[in-house]
């Protein structure tokens, strides 16, 4: 799809539900691209349980047989009534001991008995312990236990939320105890990570500002990691949070992306990717926060866990207007994108890089020229020819968009780089949208060939000949019988415009040609079955 504002673009958008900003001619990311988020690291980002086991104990637990584990757990569960009784005690020392036992039970590595603990009815007691400002150690143990309960299913989290924990945890972000503050940060991260509804409840309870106060130069690394992760959960999810509520996070994120810690960098970049995913005013706010120079540096980060969200954020920004896209070019992101295309990166990264480039080539002629000058076209064509289908699709958009907005010379350059053959090859792919994208790219190329012919460069459209030589003509013919009306109509139009005129004398008038064309037939009387070009 050429993505220029036009009536056809409107038809395509309604037919295929493509997320296209018709005014700016750029593609928003579609839901089927979220597979880049499906790494285990990202799966675990929503909620985290604090296990608290020292390394040696954790190793021993991992090595122990399953039966031994379940037997030991059963023994502990048999002790629950006594633990419940102890939690209800009026003796602070007994309360602490019992709460610590519950915390340890909820911290076991495999299948912690969250439901069983909830069913004992101790959650309201833990909530009460959160408010014991005179006893920070008890607050800490209760907060840890509730954090792990909230790390379970949505129903588990709901129990914590409906017990009134959220405003208390927000208040604990101002506790004089660093351990209590950090545990409150973690608990709120688990609640916010459960669902957009829970996230909005935390934000409405005033969770953002006291969270941002934890992100200071005196914070220890574990606090920075937890607070950045929680902040990313505050920004995450669809429907998105109210942007004005989370916009203050940008200045903190601008500092956090200069961290040398990979975990902090990863979560800070994911937060930026969520905040930049949307309308141009959101994109502008991200640009104005000053994150861009560092974001481009992070496109070269050796860790994929940092690189992916940094790339995602850059990709979001080029869905904006031409000026916002220019910001990406001006900060020298194109050489980094070239590196992502040519180095040995995984499929999801190459796909995302091609998607980003496709939105740059949907820009103005100067932006298309910047992509050409960065020597990106040749590797893009190589991917279009040889990569996995998911990457080919994005590369096809990138090339087709360049043919749509490019000058004649730019389009001639694309042809010289070998784009015709791979575009022709994709005409047989099962995705009708990509067939349309390739047809439009080829049609734009044919228009330039026609203009060259009319300028006296020869008697034939040399690009029509190149498409024929690349077996594209036969493929375009076959598209006359495609189920998709738009593809069928475009194929017929292209055949009529660029191959039929030579055969005009041999063509019958009337209805005989209505079933399609078969070019190259030397008989003067062509059968009603259609014409065969070639």
Swiss-Prot record:
PANTHER family: IMPORTIN ALPHA
Disulfide cysteine pairs (residue numbers): none
GO terms (BP aspect): NLS-bearing protein import into nucleus
MF terms (GO), sorted A to Z: nuclear import signal receptor activity; nuclear localization sequence binding
Tissue: Highly expressed in root and weakly in callus, etiolated leaf and green leaf.
Residue stretches of each ARM repeat: 111-151, 154-193, 196-236, 238-277, 280-319, 322-362, 365-404, 408-447
Subunit comment: Forms a complex with importin subunit beta-1. The whole complex, most stable and composed of importin alpha and importin beta, is referred to as PTAC or pore targeting complex.
Family: Belongs to the importin alpha family.
Protein name: Importin subunit alpha-1b
Function field: Functions in nuclear protein import. Binds specifically and directly to substrates containing either a simple or bipartite NLS motif. Promotes docking of import substrates to the nuclear envelope. In conjunction with importin beta-1, mediates the nuclear envelope docking, and the subsequent translocation into the nucleus of the constitutive morphogenetic 1 (COP1) protein containing bipartite NLS motif.
InterPro entries: ARM-like (IPR011989), ARM-type_fold (IPR016024), Arm_3 (IPR032413), Armadillo (IPR000225), Importin-a_IBB (IPR002652), Importin-a_IBB_sf (IPR036975), Importin_alpha (IPR024931)
Coiled-coil residue windows: none
Keywords per UniProt: Cytoplasm, Protein transport, Repeat, Transport
């Amino acid at each position: 799809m050429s993505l220029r504002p036009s009536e056809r673009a409107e038809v395509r958008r309604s037919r295929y539900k493509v997320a296209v900003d018709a005014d700016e001619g750029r593609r928003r990311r579609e839901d089927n691209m979220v597979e880049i988020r499906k790494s285990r690291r990202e799966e675990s980002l929503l909620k985290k349980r604090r296990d608290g086991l020292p390394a040696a104990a954790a190793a021993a637990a991992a090595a122990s047989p399953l039966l031994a584990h379940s037997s030991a757990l059963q023994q502990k569960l048999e002790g629950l009534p006594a633990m419940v009784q102890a939690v209800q005690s009026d003796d602070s020392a007994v309360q602490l001991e019992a709460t610590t036992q519950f915390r340890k039970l909820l911290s076991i590595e495999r299948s912690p008995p969250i439901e069983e603990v909830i069913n004992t009815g101790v959650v309201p007691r833990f909530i009460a312990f959160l408010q014991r400002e005179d006893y920070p150690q008890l607050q800490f143990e209760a907060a840890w236990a509730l954090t792990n309960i909230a790390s379970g299913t949505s129903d588990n989290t709901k129990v914590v939320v409906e017990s009134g924990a959220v405003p208390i945890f927000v208040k604990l972000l101002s506790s004089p105890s660093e351990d209590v503050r950090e545990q409150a940060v973690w608990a709120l991260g688990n609640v916010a990570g459960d669902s957009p509804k829970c996230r909005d409840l935390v934000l409405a309870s005033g969770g953002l500002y006291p969270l941002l106060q934890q992100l200071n130069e005196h914070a220890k690394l574990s606090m920075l990691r937890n607070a950045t992760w929680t902040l990313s959960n505050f920004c995450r999810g669809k429907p998105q949070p109210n942007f004005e509520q989370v916009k203050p996070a940008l200045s903190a994120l601008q500092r956090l992306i200069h961290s040398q810690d990979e975990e902090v960098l990863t979560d800070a970049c994911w937060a930026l990717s969520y905040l930049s995913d949307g309308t141009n005013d959101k994109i502008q706010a991200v640009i104005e926060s000053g994150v861009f120079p560092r974001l481009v540096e992070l496109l070269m980060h050796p860790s994929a866990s940092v690189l992916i969200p940094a790339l995602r954020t850059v990709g979001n920004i080029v869905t904006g207007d031409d000026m916002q896209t220019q910001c990406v070019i001006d900060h020298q992101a194109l050489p980094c994108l070239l590196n992502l295309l040519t180095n040995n990166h995984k499929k999801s990264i190459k796909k995302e890089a091609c998607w980003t480039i496709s939105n740059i080539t949907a820009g103005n002629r100067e932006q298309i020229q910047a992509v050409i000058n960065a020597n990106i076209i040749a590797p893009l064509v190589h991917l279009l020819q040889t990569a996995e289908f998911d990457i080919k699709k994005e590369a096809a958009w990138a090339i087709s968009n360049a043919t749509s907005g490019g000058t004649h010379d730019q389009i001639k350059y694309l042809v010289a780089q070998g784009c015709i053959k791979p575009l022709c090859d994709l005409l047989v792919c099962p995705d009708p949208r990509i067939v349309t994208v390739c047809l439009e790219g080829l049609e734009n190329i044919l228009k330039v060939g026609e203009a060259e012919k009319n300028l006296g460069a020869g008697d034939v459209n040399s690009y029509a000949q190149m498409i024929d030589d690349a077996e594209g003509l036969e493929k375009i013919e076959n598209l006359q019988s495609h189920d998709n009306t738009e593809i069928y109509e475009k194929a017929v139009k292209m055949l009529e415009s660029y191959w039929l005129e030579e055969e005009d004398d041999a063509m019958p008038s009337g209805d005989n040609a209505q079933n399609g064309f078969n070019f190259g037939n030397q008989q003067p009387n062509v059968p009603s079955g259609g014409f065969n070009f070639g």
